[in-house]
Amino acid sequence: VLILGYVYGKRLPVACGLKDLFGWSRLFVSRFFGTSAPVIANEFMWGLGTTMYSLAYGRMGDEAVAAITIATTIQDILVVLFQGLSAATAVILGNELGAGHLKRAEKYAVHFFILQFIATVGVAVVLIGIRWPIIGLYNITPEVARDVSLCILIFAAYMPAKMFNYVNVVGVLRSGGDTKMCLFLDTSGVWFIGVPLAFLGALVWRLPIYTVYALVMTEEVYKAVLGYIRYRQKKWLRNLASDVG
């Protein structure tokens, strides 16, 4: 309510009337669902895949579950920074692409990748340095604490690939409507690599939790390689609204 009041009170460009809200052309509807449907499917399949990770970890015993839960909780706090960066990337690039400034959008994408890399290195170094004081806040056994520490080190090692994927998939590729490729990257990475390796490592090979976690994280490298190739193809570098009435 506050946001709507501000938008219409200030008569911002998005303060449109009912005619504008519901005056959809057939091309607009087709473009909207063609772009948004893969995003919805992407989030659903990715969320379901991460649930499967939890099922695999849950079969490894209480200590393994405790270790991975603590490690991922610590990691999730840090990931918020890159989620915000990827969202900012999508907004800024989407604005430039919508205005037809394709060259500027391409330049900004490079800047965001550089910013992401610098932030990743900085956060990874800090995380490695403070992991033991943070782990010390938990009342856990030395064995669980060791596993948490190893999981955090593994996460730090994979951070460049994982955070690149955040900015590339959510910020760059989606801003240009390349959502089908985003769906392919996330779904294939989770379901063809991450989930099979999680269950193989946990139930068949009987590996320690940190080794299973390292196997699962290889999906980020897969997505980073294919995602970078897709980024270089520049199929995302387009104005989605140029011909929509």
Task: Kindly give the residue locations of the regions a language model identified.
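Short alpha-helical transmembrane segments in multi-pass integral membrane proteins
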Residues: V1-S36, L93-Y158, G201-G245
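Helix-terminus/linker motif at the lipid-water interface of multi-pass membrane proteins
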Residues: F44-I77, N95-E96, I135-P142, V204
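Small-residue-rich hydrophobic transmembrane alpha-helices
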Residues: S54, V65-R131, M163-C182
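Hydrophobic positions within alpha-helical transmembrane segments of bacterial inner-membrane proteins
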Residues: F44, L48, T120-I128, M163, ...
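Short runs within selected transmembrane alpha-helices of multi-pass transporters and secretion channels
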Residues: V1-L4, Q83-S86, F155-S175, M181-I193, ...
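Transmembrane alpha-helix boundary and packing residues in multipass membrane permease domains
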Residues: V39, E43, T51, L55, ...
